[in-house]
Amino acid sequence: MSMLKDPSSKYRAFPTIDIPDRTWPSKTITEAPIWCSSDLRDGNQSLIEPMDAVKKLRFWKTLVAVGVKEIEASFPAASQTDFDFVRTLIEDNHIPEDTTIQVLTQGREDLIARTFESLRGAKKAIVHLYNATSPSFRRIVFNQDKEGIKAIAVNAAKLFVKYAAQQPETQWTFEYSPETFSATELEFAKEVCDAVIEVWNPTPEHKMILNLPATVECATPNIYADQIEWFGRHINRRDSVIISLHTHNDRGTGVAATELGLMAGADRVEGCLFGNGERTGNVDLVTVALNMYTQGLDPQLDFSDIDGVRKVVEECNQIQVHPRHPYVGDLVHTAFSGSHQDAIRKGFTQQKDDALWEVPYLPIDPADIGRSYEAVIRVNSQSGKGGIAYLLEQEYDISLPRRMQIEFSQVVQAETDRVGLEMTAPQIYALLQREYLQANTPYALVSHRLQEENGNSFVEVEVSGKGQGETNLHWKGKGNGALEALVAGLPIGVEIMDYNEHAIGAGTNAKAAAYIELRVNGERPVHGVGIDENITTASFKALFSALNRSLSQQEAKAA
């Protein structure tokens, strides 16, 4: 079987929502929502190997540390393991004063009774009721009409009131989800929710939660936003209801649907860290939160150690985070492209600590989430001079002049093409050493002597010359400065085109780096590098580096 030529014979477009005066498109997110993690329930039930109690407790503590204030811990009536985990959290005092445990149940009385029993002794708790309301579930799964589906919700809501009254020491919050809300007729979803509201009788001081799931994402995110805005306009007692979002990622737009839903008036978001969950996953709370952060809004969640959070999530879920996952993937702050690297390097150079963040290609400062800058630029055959220069600057305090960056990038690219692999900073530095710092044939500097007299420099150098056997060469020169004097003493026509120098490090261990661009015998300019504790020695080494490289290239050209 293959894809249909006419998919409309099998699939139908989702109907649009008629709201000609919709307001959400012109709104922005101005404050963080109430966050609820469903990692330990929705996320856990989707794992090949669900978490054991040890992993669950580790995950719980991570969520608390991040700052999630409402955590759906389990489906206590589903298994003894889930029930016992809730008891452990309560009896061993793992629930901070500012954090509320949430549990899920269906509408049967035995399940509801077991759920409330699991929460005995909790200071406060959210009990979450759900039943599916969409046409396909009514027809295919439950064989119920609308009145039957509404009756399930209303009867269960009454049981919530009954069992909560038996444990008055707990501060209860009730939550209702018309599961498959986004595929349910809006008028019917409102009808069911209004009926539950009448039973629970919330007030502005003691609100209930209406959670509106895109249980299966079946339309573009703007339609979900329309559904949320319509619902918020029409639901009874809006001032006594917290509207919560619970999106999935079947179409790949869970984050967008959540953000537009918040613009449409929602107050709360349920999801999982890094988007774990059934099928393609729940909305990723981390991405939504850090999207807010990069817009200058405090998300009220702390991902200062995002890699530490990722480690816990990966080990507990036994699922690796994709290297391209927003904000946390191994490669999301990494540039291989030459033009990208050049822009990033220039951005870092100009970025000031107290200024607005404006580094190209990096929507967030990696340091804000505990990332180093080491992996920002990596070098392969697609890389250019900017990335190579950046790595040398960051790792070795080597600042190549611009024209030398171009020359050396060709050397690096030839090497990456040859080996077909990425090059690390140590490998690039080793290539710099081999190509420039160790370019000591045919002439290698052995020693030099410099004298200053009447504004002139007098230089005498000793070099080991190719084919000279045990006898070294001695050249003398005079000029306006050490380099000019050395050039004057060379038996070869040399023209200095450019010279740069800078310190490497500071204090007693500082060294000097010198860079020379010169033309030898009228040939094309080449570069040389010298590093030494003494700046004059470094400049002489740079000159011989360039001289030797030029002569070697001329020899190879003539061969």
Curated annotation (Swiss-Prot):
Record key words, sorted: Amino-acid biosynthesis, Branched-chain amino acid biosynthesis, Cytoplasm, Leucine biosynthesis, Magnesium, Metal-binding, Transferase
Gene Ontology molecular-function annotations: 2-isopropylmalate synthase activity; acetyl-CoA C-acetyltransferase activity; magnesium ion binding
UniProt family annotation: Belongs to the alpha-IPM synthase/homocitrate synthase family. LeuA type 2 subfamily.
Matching Gene3D superfamilies: 3.30.160.270, Aldolase class I
Cofactor requirements of the protein: Mg(2+)
Function: Catalyzes the condensation of the acetyl group of acetyl-CoA with 3-methyl-2-oxobutanoate (2-ketoisovalerate) to form 3-carboxy-3-hydroxy-4-methylpentanoate (2-isopropylmalate).
Record localization: Cytoplasm
Biological process according to GO: L-leucine biosynthetic process
GO CC entries: cytoplasm
Record: residues binding Mg(2+): D42, H246, H248, N282
Species for this entry: Pseudomonas fluorescens (strain SBW25)
Pyruvate carboxyltransferase domain: residues covered: 33-307
Region (Regulatory domain): 439-559
Pathway: Amino-acid biosynthesis; L-leucine biosynthesis; L-leucine from 3-methyl-2-oxobutanoate: step 1/4
E.C. no: 2.3.3.13
Protein name as it appears in the record: 2-isopropylmalate synthase
Subunit relationships: Homodimer.
Superkingdom classification of source: Bacteria
Entry-linked Pfam families: HMGL-like, IPMS_D2, LeuA_dimer
